[in-house]
A protein has these predicted regions:
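GST-like domain detector, emphasizing the conserved glutathione-binding G-site
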Residues: 1-136, 228
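Domain-wide signal for the mature, well-folded portions of proteins, strongly enriched
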Residues: 7, 17-22, 31-34, 38, ...
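Short Asp/Glu-rich motifs
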Residues: 41-43, 201, 220-221
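Acidic/histidine-enriched, glycine/proline-rich intrinsically disordered or flexible terminal extensions
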Residues: 213-228
Length: 228
């Protein structure tokens, strides 16, 4: 592994966080480039040459570049030496359940929820309405969809363990990445089961290190306090 090139571009958003957490779980050494979204850093000639999408995150392993966070997360956990403390599915059922969590988080909560809200929120509230326009109805519908998805998955949240059992998996990386951004957006999570799961998860050392790599702080509360 000493000759491997492992790099990640991305900072201060929940999508790069997914890759950072996977890297920490696999105990890998990597180099990170702390570039932000819509700061101009993703539009340089040098960056566009390796990622024509002009977005973050971007993951590199030697000559392989992956520009979607879910794909990069999956690559990291499946390609390198396995961790004894991270769950990788061996049965079709468990693979499908992890995929179900991942797709629900990526599509329903992230794309159709969080990102729609960000696109149409006012700039002073961290939104992009200067680009996409204000759309209160779209924000309301996106928030309703998030709440509906949380209500739907509540029955599958364990009382004590991780989503797939005694070890965390990619399902947890995806779900926690979404829960953290919901808290950043001040979307109330009413489910005691989900809140208890969140409180357990944030204590994991690999999660904390991924938070530091992504947000410079080990907890969301510290990050919010520093950025107020």
């Amino acid at each position: 592994m000493n000759n491997e090139i492992i790099e990640i571009w991305g900072f201060k958003t929940f999508r790069p966080f997914r890759i950072y957490w996977a890297l920490e779980e696999m105990k890998l050494n990597y180099k990170s480039y702390k570039i932000g979204s819509r700061t101009g850093e993703t539009q340089t000639t040098q960056y566009l040459k390796i990622n024509p999408k002009g977005k973050i995150p971007l993951f590199r392993h030697n000559e392989i570049y992956i520009s979607e966070s879910v794909a990069a997360m999956n690559y990291v956990v499946q390609n390198f030496k396995k961790s004894q403390d991270f769950y990788l599915p061996t049965s079709p059922k468990d693979r499908a359940k992890i995929d179900e969590w991942s797709y629900m988080c990526a599509m329903e909560i992230d794309c159709l929820g969080v990102y729609v809200m960000r696109k149409h929120k006012k700039v002073k509230n961290g939104g992009l309405s200067n680009i996409y326009g204000e759309a209160p109805n779209a924000i309301h519908a996106a928030k309703d969809n998030i709440i509906r998805m949380l209500e739907a998955c509540e029955k599958d949240i364990p009382d004590t363990n991780w989503l797939m059992g005694k070890k965390p998996s990619c399902a947890d990386i995806m779900f926690m990445s979404c829960l953290q951004v919901l808290k950043l957006y001040s979307i109330e999570i009413k489910s005691e089961k989900i809140l208890s799961y969140y409180d357990r998860s944030v204590k994991r050392p690999e999660y904390i290190e991924a938070m530091i790599q992504t947000y410079e702080y080990g907890t969301l509360e510290e990050y919010q306090k520093a950025t107020l």
